[in-house]
Amino acid sequence: MELWKRSIKELKELIEKKEVKPSEVIESFAQRTKDVEVKIKSYVTDLTEQAVERAKQLDEKISDLSEIPELFGIPIAIKDNISTEGIRTTCSSKILENYVPPFDATVIKRLKDKEYVITGKTNLDEFAMGSSTENSAFFVTRNPWDLDRVPGGSSGGSAAAVSAGLAPAALGSDTGGSIRQPAAFCGVIGLKPTYGRVSRYGLVAFASSLDQIGTFTRTVEDTAILLNIISGKDPKDSTSADREVPDFTKFLDKDIKGIKIGIPEEFFVEGLDSQIKELVMESAKLLEKEGAELVSISMPTTKYAIEAYYIIAPSEASSNLARYDGVRYGFRASDYSDLEEMYSKTRDEGFGAEVKRRIMLGTYSLSSGYYDAYYLKAQKVRTLIYQDFMKAFESVDIILTPTTPDVAFRIGEKVDDPLQMYLSDIFTVSVNMAGVPGMSIPCGFKDGLPVGMQLIGKPFDEGTIIQVADRFTKLKDFSKDFPQL
């Protein structure tokens, strides 16, 4: 089997046994990138040449090591809203097109400590605002399973890269579904950890109370390996949780007898494609055969999640994005007569339509006279959504839902209808609102396009999600299914 088809775990073992060199691993992925990247366009900054050079250095280093670091020579792609020292970090926005950060995000530092190799910075919806990666200021990334369709968003580039075999894993960020929805559309595994599990230091902020960095992989085992590395308290992020990080690989290869799985009626409603509903319920029944118990539950407030999310997230964005004014870094308009005109022209020329829409929505929601009617009310709904989850978790260990209401849609299909676009996150946003962990895993295909199933866990209980997902993928394994490109 070609090296680019192998998982982190498999590559790690081959390198440790000295059966392959890091350079051979990276060259295999570099060749794959050369062959297919032109079709899918997942990278804003393609770093495969530098990756090959870095791997050659690791070849020489390996003989001097008594212990080989966990990600030694393993290629990983990084979403382009995560700071990488000395490497352009654009957020797929014109306003940051030439911005090169002077520091690494904490997650990048943790990967570097394990000697990973960065393959590139992946495309996204501008400032992570979108569900299709069509809002990138540079180009549209395509779904490897059907090049006329979107890969999902906002982390579409990361999902497409892992799906097409350009890297065995990638990092993304998830504010309302931006890891899980593209993972479902591209047929890979996407995990959004509990809010606070992974440091956000160095993640360019969209909505600070909702954003969380997570992973894309092809196997649950690889998810566990990466989560072990990137999790944990960080003094540079006051919202990172001071909680002990368990060894997530200990949750692999366990049975699921007696685990109670909640099936919420609000997630199996009109608007959900009938074939997806069937596939997800078949998958739930498979888990039941393995000894899990299926429990019908109700989470009535979750149906208001989208409305509340599109007040809270834009409100936080309008505040966070105020810093892009052309003064210290990033794009600056060239033709202006005074400071005020420089600000407004820079922001007008630098931001795309969706980002402007959300800044305006957020500013409106926070303005005097509307704050109580919109923002405050949305925060109250958020509390009720959290309480819905906590009540459900009194009787179940994990919740199972579809990840998306339908498979990947065609490029251009929803561009002129933002509300339709927003609804593709209908099953994912409530997880961010409650701050709980969620994972999308492939559970089948509809008309040749991947379908995702979502597993939602208690706060800081990614372990049970990994346990159930691992058991499921041993029954239905899609990790070696690659799209024909």
Curated annotation (Swiss-Prot):
It holds the Pfam family Amidase. Disulfide bonds: none annotated. GO terms for molecular function: ATP binding; glutaminyl-tRNA synthase (glutamine-hydrolyzing) activity. It catalyses: L-glutamyl-tRNA(Gln) + L-glutamine + ATP + H2O = L-glutaminyl-tRNA(Gln) + L-glutamate + ADP + phosphate + H(+). Belongs to the amidase family. GatA subfamily. Keywords: ATP-binding, Ligase, Nucleotide-binding, Protein biosynthesis. Heterotrimer of A, B and C subunits. It comes from Persephonella marina (strain DSM 14350 / EX-H1). One of its GO terms (cellular component) is glutamyl-tRNA(Gln) amidotransferase complex. Allows the formation of correctly charged Gln-tRNA(Gln) through the transamidation of misacylated Glu-tRNA(Gln) in organisms which lack glutaminyl-tRNA synthetase. The reaction takes place in the presence of glutamine and ATP through an activated gamma-phospho-Glu-tRNA(Gln). This is Glutamyl-tRNA(Gln) amidotransferase subunit A. One of its GO terms (biological process) is translation. The active site is at K79, S154, S178. InterPro entries: Amidase, Amidase_CS, Amidase_dom, AS_sf, GatA. Its EC number is 6.3.5.7.
